């Protein structure tokens, strides 16, 4: 049954959903990597699709920017459409000099300055972590493709334009591999409703060096990340 933000019916979504931030990126993933694709959502332009990858039913849908937005879509997919696994696929910024442009980062955990998980967890700190089997399957899928993926902590920020750049020094000291805006929220929703989640990011820019990937480079490295995510689903079956 349709929700306020998703105009689909039970069965329209697979039990596994890949979620980029950009709905147009979701469309690209569906058209490039899936077969027998059909659109299952268009509310507020947040496009969702379901198809098959090597015979396995998989869905892909955008989640927008930031923890509040992604939390809405993740919650509705889980509680109203029976989704059991969510894989966020997106970009991140690097703060450490040993993390390079175009690196693939598998988010084992996610720190955050958001209060959303504290609200969920009665004002206590919540350790926002990915599902171990999903982390392992993604790492194995990357290795099979010859990609040296990094595995570790992300930082999910509420602000894209941070007023306090000294926080990047703290992140580097604590070994944060990438800064993005959603992983901690998705992990929190997954924990609340007893399902599994993972975030895989590609480093699109380096906060220290101000390096940025070109549009063509982003497309190539993004495709590597999507293939890792899709192959990890097969490994998890």
Swiss-Prot record:
Catalytic residue positions: 205
InterPro entries reported in the protein's UniProt record: DeoD-type, Nucleoside_phosphorylase_CS, Nucleoside_phosphorylase_d, Nucleoside_phosphorylase_sf
PROSITE patterns from the UniProt entry: PNP_UDP_1
Gene3D superfamilies the record matches: Nucleoside phosphorylase domain
Source organism superkingdom: Bacteria
Biological process, per Gene Ontology: purine nucleoside catabolic process
Family stated for the protein in its record: Belongs to the PNP/UDP phosphorylase family.
Record function comment: Catalyzes the reversible phosphorolytic breakdown of the N-glycosidic bond in the beta-(deoxy)ribonucleoside molecules, with the formation of the corresponding free purine bases and pentose-1-phosphate.
Protein name listed in UniProt: Purine nucleoside phosphorylase DeoD-type
Organism, scientific name: Edwardsiella ictaluri (strain 93-146)
Gene encoding the protein: deoD
């Amino acid at each position: 049954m349709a929700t306020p933000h998703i105009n689909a019916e039970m069965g329209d979504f697979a039990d596994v959903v890949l979620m980029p931030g950009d709905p147009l990126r979701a469309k690209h993933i569906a058209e490039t990597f899936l077969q027998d694709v059909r659109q299952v959502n268009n509310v507020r332009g947040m496009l969702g699709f379901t198809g098959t990858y090597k015979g396995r039913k998989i869905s892909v849908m955008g989640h927008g920017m930031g923890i509040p937005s992604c939390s809405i879509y993740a919650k509705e997919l889980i509680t109203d459409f029976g989704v059991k696994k969510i894989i966020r696929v997106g970009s991140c910024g690097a703060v450490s000099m040993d993390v390079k442009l175009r690196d693939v980062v598998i988010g084992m955990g996610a720190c955050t300055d958001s209060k959303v998980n504290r609200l969920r967890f009665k004002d206590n700190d919540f350790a926002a972590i990915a599902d171990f089997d999903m982390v392992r399957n993604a790492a194995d899928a990357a290795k099979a493709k010859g990609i040296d993926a990094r595995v570790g902590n992300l930082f999910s920020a509420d602000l894209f334009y941070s007023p306090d750049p000294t926080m990047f020094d703290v992140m580097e000291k604590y070994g944060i591999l990438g800064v993005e805006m959603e992983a901690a929220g998705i992990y929190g929703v997954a924990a609340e409703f007893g399902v599994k989640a993972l975030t895989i990011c590609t480093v699109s820019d380096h906060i220290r060096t101000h390096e940025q990937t070109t549009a063509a480079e982003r497309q190539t490295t993004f495709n590597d990340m999507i293939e890792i995510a899709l192959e990890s689903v097969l490994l998890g079956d």
